[in-house]
């Protein structure tokens, strides 16, 4: 299943193409794999035609496996760009709501996440950045802001795109210096939420989203 999924998501198998039958896979295993891929909107079976790759518009793009399979491919770069556009639309408004509605516990949670981000960029020795720790803390920072918004629909939407956000965090954190450069922007968001200044929180998040967009464009640009 994972092998076929990666071939589809990285463009090796294109929409309309017949899905090949691997010689080393049993019929039972293949049938189960195709059942899962069908549920994710990636393939469809037709009588006398076989199983073909469905159009990208049918794919469940926020599915955890679908997100994982497209890492490193051209479609992954396009997905990161589109995800950044979604974040630019949603996260500034979310930060403004959090500045109005965050409880003391919410603020403490966001603050802890920020402190952990700082700690992850202050590793001693050869490793100047603990990428895994930074990504985890960055994820908790943004998830905490979504919860602090007090909007249940927005919170559920945030849970839906969480796996995709982790992909974005991992991609933009790997560039040397990018994580540390983002810290002042995260701090500005936290301070605005603490001070209960929705307009400042919105502006600070917009600044962070602009920074993120630049990092995504650097990833996409030829080296």
Provide a role label for each language-model segment.
Residues 174-177:
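Structural signature of alpha-solenoid helical repeat scaffolds
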Residues 83-171, 183-191, 200-215:
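Conserved amphipathic alpha-helical segments that form helical-bundle/coiled-coil interaction surfaces
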Residues 214-223:
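Generic C-terminal helix-cap and adjacent flexible tail
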Residues 1-89, 96, 222-223:
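Short linear motifs at protein or domain termini
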């Amino acid at each position: 299943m994972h092998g076929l999924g990666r071939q589809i998501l990285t463009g090796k198998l294109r929409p309309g193409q017949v899905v090949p039958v691997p010689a080393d896979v049993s019929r039972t295993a293949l049938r189960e794999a195709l059942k899962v891929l069908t549920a994710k909107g990636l393939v469809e079976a037709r009588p006398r035609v076989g199983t073909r790759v469905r159009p990208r518009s049918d794919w469940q793009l926020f599915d955890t496996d679908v997100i994982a399979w497209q890492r490193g491919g051209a479609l992954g770069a396009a997905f990161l760009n589109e995800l950044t556009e979604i974040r630019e639309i949603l996260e500034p408004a979310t930060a403004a709501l959090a500045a109005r509605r965050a409880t003391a516990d919410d603020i403490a949670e966001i603050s802890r996440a920020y402190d952990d981000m700082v700690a992850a960029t202050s590793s001693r020795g050869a490793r100047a950045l603990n990428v895994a720790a930074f990504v985890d803390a960055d994820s908790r920072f943004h998830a905490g802001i979504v919860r602090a918004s007090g909007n249940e629909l927005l919170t559920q939407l945030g849970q839906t795109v969480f796996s995709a956000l982790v992909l974005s965090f991992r991609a933009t954190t790997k560039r040397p210096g990018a994580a540390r450069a983002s810290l002042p922007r995260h701090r500005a968001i936290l301070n605005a939420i603490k001070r209960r200044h929705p307009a400042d929180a919105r502006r600070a998040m917009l600044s962070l989203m602009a920074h993120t967009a630049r990092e995504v464009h650097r990833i996409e640009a030829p080296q």
